[in-house]
Structures are given as C-alpha cells and as structure tokens.
Regions:
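Signal peptide-proximal N-terminal region
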Residues: 60-77, 204
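Short, high-confidence coil segments that cap the C-terminus of an alpha-helix
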Residues: 74-76, 109, 208-209, 398-399
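Active-site-adjacent helix-turn-beta-strand microarchitecture at beta-sheet edges
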Residues: 26-48, 78, 86-190, 226-359, ...
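Gram-negative bacterial Sec-dependent N-terminal signal peptides
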Residues: 2-22
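Feature captures C-terminal
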Residues: 32-35, 45-58, 134-141, 145-146, ...
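Hard-cation-handling environments
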Residues: 307-418
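Short acidic/His/Gly/Ser-rich catalytic and metal-binding motifs that mark active-site loops
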Residues: 174-179, 223-224, 413, 503-504
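Short catalytic helix/loop segments, enriched in acidic residues and glycine
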Residues: 52-65, 101, 105, 188-196
C-alpha cells in the first residue's frame, strides 16, 4: 500500500472536516426563542382528581395558552414526556391507558421516553399504545436480545424555526429488576449513560443537530447518591462531555427538581413558588413531579449555536392545599388561579371515564381506620396495608407466611366504604399470587437475602407472620408464626409472581420443585379477602415491631 504524501493527506482531512460541519440553517447573530414544556410519571391520571386537581383537560388549556404566548413572541414549543404513562388509576388501567395516549395526542406531545411502567403490560399492549400515540416512544438503550436490535427509536429530530433539535430517549436499566421478569425474557436494558455517549456521537456525525436534548426515565438523585437504585440523570450528566446535552427532561423518581442549594433539592416544594432546576456539567436537569400536577416550562434563547436558559418554572395544574379556618372547618383552596378544562378534551375523555367508573364504584367492604399504603411509608417501614395484602395471599394459598416488596403497594385506603377501585389503586399491576414450599433452611436463606433490601426503594420488603432481628447481614430470633424456624420443617410462603421471578432483585423461587403459580390476580385476591372479612379492623393489622434492623 502506498501512503499519501503528508500535504495531500492534510488537504483531504481538511476537506472532510469541512463536509462534516453542521449544515447550519439558522441565521448568524439572530436570537431564536425555544420553549421546552415537559411532564413525567403520568400514571393514568387522564381525569381530574377527586378534588378537581390536574387532569389532561386542564393541562391542554394550559399548554394551549403557552403555545399562543410563545408564538406571539416569535418562538417555538417542544412538548416532551419523561414516561410512565401507565399504571396507577383503575379507569386508565382497565383500558390499557388508551384515554391517556389519545388525550396526549390532543394536547400535542412531540415525544416521550419509555418508562419502566410501560412494561407493566405485555409487549403486545405496548405496541398497541404506540399505535394509539401520534408521537414517538423513545429509548436508545432497550434491545431485543435475540436480534441485537433496538426495540424503540433511539431519537427523534424536530425542526423549530431554523433550528434542528435532536431528542434522545433513555430508560432506567433498573427496569429489568423492578419490572415483571416474565415480560423481559428477550429484552435487554443496557446502561443508559454508556448508550447516551454512543448516540450523541452518532447524532453529531450523521444528523448534525444544533441542539441535543435527552428525555429520560432514570430518576434524579441529589449529588448522584442513588443508593440501591440504578444511576440517574445526575450521574449521567457528569459522565458525558460537558454541555453535550442542552438539558435532560427527566422522570422516574417523581420529584419536583427544584434545588435549594448545590446538589440538594428542596424538601417540600410549595406549588407556585420559584423553582431552580439542577445543572450538572453544563447540562440542565428538570423533572415535573408526577401525575400531571405540573407542567414544566423552560424558556431558552438560541443564538449562534448556543442555548441559554432565560426562565424556568413549574406551573401547577389546579393544585390545592387544605386550609383549616378558625371555626374548625376546612376546605381545599387553589395555590394559583384556576385553569379551566378544555371542552374538546372533556368530550374525548368523558366516555372513557364513564366506562371505567361504572365497573369500579360498587362497594365490596369497609374498614374502620386508615390502611397505610403511601409511598413514603411502605418503602421505609412495615404497614398495616402490607399486612392486609399478605393476609389475603396467605388465606388464598394456605401459606405460613408472606413476603412482598413495598413498591408493589401503590396507595392507601381511607376509613369507610371500600370499592374495587380502591383495591385496584393499591395493587394496579395485575401480578399473580404464587407460593412455594421450602425447607426451614431455604426459608432462612431466603429471608436473610430479602432482609438486605434497603429502605427508600421499591424493594424494601413487607412481611406477615415473620419476626426477626437483622444485624450486619444476618438474622437472629427468626420465627414463623411466633415459632423458631425448624431447618428440617417445610414451610409455605406466599408472594407475587413479580418477586418470585426475581423482581426487585429478590431471590428467584419459580424454579423450586414446590413452586405453584395459582393464576389468581393479586387485586382480585385482595378484593375477595375484603369481601369475606368486612368490616376490617385496621388496628388488628398494625405491625408491632416484629421485624427490626440494627
């Protein structure tokens, strides 16, 4: 092989460099206005809450007004979602989130990240949701194992005025752990930060966008301290070339990302007050809490290839606070002026709401006190809701004890009448109740492993008929139904198919000889237990310190 002379080689390199520079369509020294709107973790809340908060009808009114305002100033809007459209409201869940995606179409979403809860249903349902949606589902790091091909588009390109904007989608690689393993037999979740580096290089080489934004479902953790969760947006931003993304539109941790100081979010953000987004390594990071409670608004000025944020706010969507007056009476009042609901959206969504509501409002039982299922409790401590759910599974399977991850409990039940809707809000995932017969030694090994799951994660375990003291990775005083575990005895454990197949990092038990899949859906099992045991006494299920960590 002959080598090119140095002068010829340099000339060719220079020519190649010239041909690979971005074909800039924007005008030099002109300032363009670009507004990025964003939501995340919608979780089925297409309709207003019982207090008249959020909902897609009010969201459309708000977004339409912002579009009009920005257009009058000569600017452009891009509307993104950080994912998790699925799971959380029965009227939506029973209809596979069809009303939610059709409502998002009407609002005019441009793209969304694929969230972990998009996999709460089989892939066939997810593909149907893609057909309903008129915007792309983006994820660069989800692959089909058998083909090595991506399951979704890695990015989408949008032109706003003369500016070429690339939007990358990324999904937490925790999905394989916290999702239903039965749906992931041929799916691989690669490390999103590593995939982002590759995609950014590909974009800059081939598409040559003026701006790159990531819409992600990875979580925001202060200073990158992600604990037992997979690394999130902060960690990724720090790992990328400085400023290689203009911003990250996030989701998954379900926080208002409003910084109190460097690397520390506000603990109790007050709706309607100023919100300072995070910035790491020259990359803005935003997140709009959950459920459509807010629409995030980031106003940028683009000039000569540079994106400068000039304004950011979280706009509450009819959020209310409870106020108690001097006479002892209380009411819920708006934080900010009311946003009217869009009539066209109401016309679209009302039939869906009525269809779902009719199936859910029938009373199935009652309880005399609160059954605690709030996220801030079930991921940190034992609760009476956990005990009720496991009692139902134990009763159905004839088990000696029960275990499940706290992240599978999604809501509380207030004192009073209980409807099927209440049950489905608590257990919306449609997991199957299973059981396994294990030796006492296997029980000790299993519970020792599960007890290592840390608080502040969905993996934190809820127990029933189990007591122990955990210290330095070992269990002492381990008892089942008040009796010390006999290594030679056989015990039956009830749990969910999700945990049995390794969900949330739990030891797999579906390969054990004594494993049985009952085929009964968790919410149906809980519903029948409530029907048979009502009125429930909430205090009878209150944990009494049976399990403790030192």
């Amino acid at each position: 092989m002959k080598f090119l002379k140095r002068g010829v080689a340099l000339a060719l390199l220079a020519a190649f460099a010239l041909t690979t520079q971005p074909a800039q369509a924007y005008e030099k020294d002109k300032t363009y206005k670009i507004t990025i709107l964003h939501t995340n973790d919608h979780h089925g809340h297409f309709w207003r809450s019982e207090y008249g908060e959020y909902g897609l009808a009010a969201q459309k009114t708000l977004v339409d007004s912002i579009r009009k305002e920005v257009a009058q100033e000569g600017g452009s809007v891009l509307l993104l979602s950080g994912g998790d459209i699925n799971t959380g409201v029965p009227e939506s869940d029973l209809q596979d989130a069809e009303p939610d995606f059709r409502g998002m179409n009407l609002i005019g979403y441009d793209a969304m990240a694929v969230g972990n809860h998009e996999f709460d249903n089989p892939l066939t349902v997810l593909r149907q949701q893609e057909k309903w949606a008129k915007f792309p589902f983006l994820s660069a790091n989800i692959y089909q194992k058998s083909t090595g091909e991506r399951l979704f588009k890695p990015w989408a390109i949008f032109t706003r005025q003369d500016i070429k904007i690339a939007v990358i989608g990324l999904t937490t690689d925790d999905t394989a752990k916290i999702g239903n393993p039965e749906y992931f037999t041929d799916i691989e979740f690669r490390k999103p930060a590593e995939e982002a580096k590759v995609v950014i290089q590909e974009l800059n080489m081939n598409e040559k966008p003026d701006v790159i934004i990531a819409t992600t479902h990875m979580g925001h953790y202060d200073n990158g301290d992600h604990g037992s969760n997979a690394p999130g947006d902060v960690e990724m931003a720090r790992s990328l070339p400085a400023g290689s993304l203009a911003m990250i539109v996030g989701g998954h941790s379900q926080d208002p990302v409003c910084m109190a100081s460097e690397n520390k979010k506000q603990v109790n953000y007050v709706p309607g007050t100023p919100c300072a987004p995070d910035k790491q390594n020259g990359i803005w990071i935003v997140q709009a809490h959950e459920w459509g409670k807010y629409v995030g608004r980031a106003d940028f000025e683009f000039r000569n290839g540079e994106m400068k944020m000039v304004n950011y706010q979280l706009i509450p969507v009819n959020l209310k606070k409870k106020v108690t007056w001097d006479n002892g009476k209380s009411e819920r009042v708006l934080y900010t002026p009311e946003i009217a609901e869009n009539p066209q959206m109401l016309l679209l969504l009302t039939p869906f709401q009525n269809k779902g509501k009719a199936q859910l409002e029938v009373k199935i039982g009652s309880v005399n006190g609160l059954l605690e299922g709030d996220r801030s409790k079930v991921r940190f401590v034992q609760t009476n809701m956990g005990r009720v759910i496991l009692a139902a599974q134990i009763a159905r399977t004839g088990a000696d004890f029960g275990v499940m991850s706290g992240g599978g409990i999604r809501d509380s039940i207030e004192a009073g009448d209980i409807t099927y809707k209440s049950v489905l809000k608590v257990q919306p995932f449609g997991n199957i109740v299973v059981y396994a017969d294990m030796s006492g030694k296997e029980v000790v090994d299993y519970l020792t492993a599960v007890a290592q799951m840390k608080p502040d994660s969905g993996a934190y375990p809820q127990f029933a008929n189990v007591s122990f003291v955990a210290k330095e990775g070992k269990l002492t005083e381990l008892k089942i139904k008040g009796e010390p575990v006999d290594p030679a005895k056989t015990y039956r454990m009830a749990t969910l198919s999700f945990n049995a197949t390794g969900g949330d990092g739990y030891p797999r038990i579906d390969n054990k000889p004594g494993y049985v899949n009952t085929g009964f859906i968790d919410a149906e099992v809980l519903k029948e237990f409530i029907q048979q045991n009502s009125p429930l006494d909430a205090a009878a299920f209150t944990p009494k310190g049976e399990v403790s960590w030192l």
